[in-house]
């Protein structure tokens, strides 16, 4: 039997997930928390195998709660279930100690599959999120300055231009 803790600041979300999991053989919702602090306390004092954690909550959010739970109760597996799927967040969450990452738009069967996978010791990342993470490694977003790719000489010329100096063929200015 897989004991699951639901953590979300929206009662309606918790009730919906609870309802989905009620009918699943081998999975039992053993508790709920509406904030990260309560989730951390709950995991330290109760038997829980898997935590379905929301990212954005009052107080400490899902990322910090994941760090704290992963540090203090290594046997508890955490799945981030969130609307925030853009990079670099999934990687940060996994580095913080989560075993899984799902979008709140996931199908109920995918949530069940994720719970079973992380309980068995595997990691689970929704395929669309995993693809996005992989692509960001191949094609990192252009976040550095456009001047970062200039040679030292090209940078000197750019600085001269910004100071209003004429560059032309003046070898004295360019120190050729």
Where are these regions (language model features)?
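Acidic, metal-coordinating helix/loop segments flanking the phosphotransfer/catalytic sites
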Residues: 32-50
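Active-site residues of response regulator receiver
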Residues: 54, 82
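Helix-turn-helix DNA-binding segment
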Residues: 144-176
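Acidic catalytic/metal-coordinating carboxylates
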Residues: 35-38, 60-64, 85
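Short amphipathic alpha-helix used as the core "switch/output" element in two-component signaling
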Residues: 41, 63-75
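Conserved acidic segment of CheY-like receiver
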Residues: 1-13, 17-21, 150
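Short, flexible helix-to-coil linker/hinge segments that flank and couple to helix-turn-helix
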Residues: 88-95, 100-152, 156
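Receiver (REC) domain active-site loop signature in two-component systems and cognate sites
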Residues: 57
């Amino acid at each position: 039997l897989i004991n699951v803790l639901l953590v979300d600041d929206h009662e309606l979300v918790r009730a919906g997930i609870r309802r989905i999991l009620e009918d699943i053989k081998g999975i039992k919702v053993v508790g709920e928390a509406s904030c990260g602090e309560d989730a951390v306390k709950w995991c330290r004092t109760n038997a829980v195998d898997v935590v379905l954690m929301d990212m954005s909550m009052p107080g400490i959010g899902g990322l910090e709660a994941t760090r704290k739970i992963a540090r203090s109760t290594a046997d508890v597996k955490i799945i981030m279930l969130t609307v925030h799927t853009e990079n670099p967040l999934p990687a940060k969450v996994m580095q913080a100690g989560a075993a899984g990452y799902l979008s709140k738009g996931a199908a109920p069967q995918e949530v069940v599959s994720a719970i079973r996978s992380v309980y068995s010791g595997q990691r689970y990342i929704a395929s669309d999120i995993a693809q996005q993470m992989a692509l960001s490694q191949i094609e990192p977003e252009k976040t550095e300055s456009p001047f970062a790719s200039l040679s030292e000489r090209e940078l000197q010329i750019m600085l001269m231009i910004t100071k209003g100096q004429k560059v032309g063929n003046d070898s004295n200015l360019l120190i050729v």
